[in-house]
């Protein structure tokens, strides 16, 4: 609805209706700063120009209630009709509220951790960013697919295969069993460097498609992925497809990429094949002397396939991949292909210190999830509920705490995850939003028990607090559209916190169930509309909207 309000304001401004000068404002529902731009050209004060524009405006929109000129700003205020239509649209559209009719096929590649052990807490920041972006794009109307790109041809995988051959797999969660084999194999290689030749032979045999070697690699990778999928499922993340990089060697795409680069005279051959990129210090190796390709070569092939099949493709990568991302994009441009849009994210630490990932010393995502679940259970265990219900709520609160804390920080900022803060019901957390949703559900349940009348929202009954809340509710589709454009999922987390906080202010200041009948119907409509926005919003963040807490 707010998107419609923006359209009406642009139309009302006529020749001055340039969207880039419109701002959300604390002092108005929407403000134009066009007068500040025109002041330089016309050699008048912004106030004079804004006064003139407002004086000559002919507003015909039923959604614009009033317009004011204040110190150079042109302030627009929504009408009662706009407020009424907002609440009615939310209640009518219900689960569909927030949906946009945008079209197109989008591919989002995220997580894509090496299959040599369990995910750590940095990996799940990647997963949560990618999954949230995918959910929001789907809400916007796009046909979205998510991929996990499996690095099954890398050196780490060959070391894992060697480790499984030498030490076997222990009876534990599959990805953790694979990690132990990988760690032991690394120790073995350090004390027996002559085994490096065996690793190289494994890599070459796998790339050449040797049947027995392929079987060993597939077993190792599938075992790791089995455990990784279990972890992702606990935080409500699933991928549409796991795409193995070896597919692009087998299906000819790697050969196609190398062939085009060779044909265009872009590769140097000195045993190995390399490419020199303008603006980069070092040449990029595409093929080793023994004929095996590198990760970037196979990734180029994957992105050639993406170009052929998708209009828009987005990768989520750690900040340590910035150089790699720039090299990949540059070579794709040389191939005449579109590079991916990349969301880079910074690393995650715990209050006790940063993660360490080599000799078995890392904080796995499984450990983190288990810890947060235990703490959520401690908080909820004293509640007067059935045991099973408490367990389900504790799990939902734990997953919500992790997902929300990981998404509320802008991807480019380093974050520290503190479970005690993430589980605080009074802070800016998922549990605070879940509790707000449960509060709205509780109010509506009590209203039904009391014989809830037909809801009827009336704009003219709105107090300032009610008006503020309804205007916020109108912005959900607008925020969805912003994220599609800006790829900043933290903006949606901020929006939902604002809705929850404003709703709780409304509830504190406005009796609902004890209000007189007309006001009661009006306020119950606001509560129900808020419930819809909080529920739909939590689902976009991959968090369960609890009805009881």
From Swiss-Prot:
Subcellular location: Cytoplasm
PANTHER family attached to this UniProt entry: ARGININE--TRNA LIGASE, CYTOPLASMIC, ARGINYL-TRNA SYNTHETASE
Name of encoding gene: argS
Motif ('HIGH' region): 113-123
Protein name as it appears in the record: Arginine--tRNA ligase
Provenance organism: Archaeoglobus fulgidus (strain ATCC 49558 / DSM 4304 / JCM 9628 / NBRC 100126 / VC-16)
Gene3D superfamilies: Arginyl tRNA synthetase N-terminal domain (3.30.1360.70), HUPs (3.40.50.620), Isoleucyl-tRNA Synthetase, Domain 1 (1.10.730.10)
NCBIfam families: argS
Pfam family of the protein (one): Arg_tRNA_synt_N
GO terms under biological process: arginyl-tRNA aminoacylation
MF terms in GO: arginine-tRNA ligase activity; ATP binding
Annotated GO CC locations: cytoplasm
Keywords: Aminoacyl-tRNA synthetase, ATP-binding, Cytoplasm, Ligase, Nucleotide-binding, Protein biosynthesis
CDD domains xref list: Anticodon_Ia_Arg, ArgRS_core
Family that this chain belongs to: Belongs to the class-I aminoacyl-tRNA synthetase family.
């Amino acid at each position: 609805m707010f998107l419609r309000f923006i359209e009406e304001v642009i139309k009302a401004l006529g020749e001055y209706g340039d969207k880039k000068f419109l701002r959300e404002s604390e002092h108005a529902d929407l403000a134009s700063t066009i007068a500040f731009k025109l002041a330089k050209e016309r050699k008048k004060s912004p106030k004079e120009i804004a006064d003139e524009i407002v004086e000559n405006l002919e507003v015909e929109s039923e959604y614009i209630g009033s317009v004011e000129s204040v110190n150079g700003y042109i302030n627009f205020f929504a009408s009662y009709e706009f407020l009424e239509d907002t609440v009615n649209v939310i209640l009518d559209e219900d689960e569909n509220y927030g949906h946009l009719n945008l079209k197109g096929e989008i591919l989002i590649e995220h997580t894509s951790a090496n299959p040599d052990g369990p995910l750590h807490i940095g990996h799940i920041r990647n997963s949560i960013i990618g999954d949230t972006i995918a959910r929001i794009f789907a809400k916007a109307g796009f046909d979205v697919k998510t991929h996990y790109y499996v690095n099954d041809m890398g050196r780490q995988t060959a070391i894992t295969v060697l480790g499984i051959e030498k030490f076997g797999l222990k009876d534990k969660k599959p990805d953790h069993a694979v990690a132990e084999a990988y760690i032991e194999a690394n120790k073995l290689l350090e004390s027996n460097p002559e085994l490096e030749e065996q690793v190289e032979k494994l890599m070459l045999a796998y790339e050449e498609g040797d049947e027995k070697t392929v079987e060993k690699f597939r077993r190792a990778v599938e075992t790791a992925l089995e455990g990784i999928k279990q972890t992702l499922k606990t935080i409500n993340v699933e991928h549409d497809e796991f795409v193995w990089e070896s597919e692009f060697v087998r299906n000819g795409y790697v050969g196609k990429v190398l062939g085009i680069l060779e044909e265009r005279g872009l590769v140097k051959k000195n045993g190995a094949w390399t490419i020199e990129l303008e603006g980069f210090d070092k040449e990029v190796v595409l093929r080793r002397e023994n004929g095996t390709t590198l990760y970037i070569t196979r990734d180029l092939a994957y992105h050639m396939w993406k170009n052929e099949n998708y209009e828009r493709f987005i990768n989520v990568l750690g900040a340590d991949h910035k150089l790699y991302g720039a090299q990949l994009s540059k070579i794709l441009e040389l191939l005449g292909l579109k590079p991916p849009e990349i969301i880079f994210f910074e690393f995650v630490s715990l209050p006790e210190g940063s993660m360490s990932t080599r000799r078995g010393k890392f904080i796995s995502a499984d450990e983190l999830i288990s810890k947060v679940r235990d703490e959520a259970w401690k908080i909820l265990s004293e509640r007067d509920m059935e045991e099973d219900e408490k367990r389900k709520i504790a799990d939902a609160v734990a997953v919500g705490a992790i997902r929300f804390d990981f998404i509320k920080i802008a991807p480019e900022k380093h974050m520290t995850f503190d479970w005690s803060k993430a589980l605080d019901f009074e802070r800016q957390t998922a549990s605070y939003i879940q509790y707000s949703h449960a509060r709205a559900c509780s109010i509506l349940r009590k209203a039904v028990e009391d014989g809830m009348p037909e809801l009827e929202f009336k704009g003219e009954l709105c107090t300032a607090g009610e008006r503020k809340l309804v205007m916020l509710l109108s912005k959900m589709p607008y925020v969805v559209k912003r994220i599609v454009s800006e790829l900043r999922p933290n903006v949606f987390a901020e929006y939902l916190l604002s809705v929850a906080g404003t709703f709780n202010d409304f509830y504190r200041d406005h009796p609902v169930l004890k209000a007189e009948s007309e006001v009661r119907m009006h306020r119950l409509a606001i509560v129900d509309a808020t419930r819809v926005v909080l529920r739909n919003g939590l689902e976009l963040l991959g968090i369960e909207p609890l009805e009881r807490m």
